Swiss-Prot record:
This is ATP synthase epsilon chain. It comes from Halalkalibacterium halodurans (strain ATCC BAA-125 / DSM 18197 / FERM 7344 / JCM 9153 / C-125) (Bacillus halodurans). F-type ATPases have 2 components, CF(1) - the catalytic core - and CF(0) - the membrane proton channel. CF(1) has five subunits: alpha(3), beta(3), gamma(1), delta(1), epsilon(1). CF(0) has three main subunits: a, b and c. The gene is atpC. It is found in: Cell membrane. It is a peripheral membrane protein. Its main location: membrane. Coiled coil: none annotated.
Length: 133
C-alpha cells in the first residue's frame, strides 16, 4: 500500500518526519484528509491538531497556523509553531489558557484586542488537547 512522506517544519527546525497512510489537517476552510496520490494543493492552516495515521497508530502534532503543501506522495507542513505531545509543557499551556480566558473577560469591559486573546486561548486549548490533558 502506498504511503505519504510527511515533514512538519517550523522556523526553528523539523518537528516530525515519517511515512504515514493518511494525514488530517485543519485548514481555514475546514478539515482536510490527505491520502496517497492526492492532487497537488497548497492550503493555509489554522490552529489545530495534525493527525498522522500509520496502520492503527495515530500520532498528533499541535500546529499553530501555517501552510500545508500536498504532492501525490509527499506532504509538507510549514507551521508557525508545532509541538509533539511529549514536547508540550502542560503547566505552561494551562497558564496560557487561564491568562487568555482572563483577557477575554476583560475584553468585554476594556479596550483589549479580542481576536488576539481568542487566538491565544485556541492555541493553549489545542496544545492541551494534543497533550491529552
Amino acid at each position: 500500500m502506498p504511503t505519504l512522506h510527511v515533514n512538519v517544519v517550523t522556523p526553528d527546525g523539523k518537528v516530525y518526519e515519517g511515512d504515514v497512510d493518511m494525514v488530517s489537517v485543519k485548514t481555514v476552510e475546514g478539515e482536510l484528509g490527505i491520502l496517497p496520490r492526492h492532487i497537488p494543493l497548497v492550503a493555509p492552516l489554522t490552529v489545530g491538531a495534525v493527525r498522522l495515521k500509520k496502520g492503527s497508530t495515530v500520532d498528533l502534532v499541535a500546529v499553530s497556523g501555517g501552510f500545508v503543501e500536498v504532492r501525490p506522495d509527499q506532504v509538507t507542513i510549514l507551521a508557525e509553531a508545532a509541538e509533539l505531545p511529549s514536547d508540550i509543557d502542560v503547566e505552561r499551556a494551562r497558564s496560557a489558557k487561564e491568562r487568555a480566558e482572563k483577557r477575554l473577560q476583560q475584553a468585554k469591559q476594556e479596550n483589549i484586542d479580542f481576536k488576539r486573546a481568542e487566538l491565544s486561548l485556541r492555541r493553549a486549548t489545542n496544545r492541551l488537547d494534543v497533550a491529552g490533558r
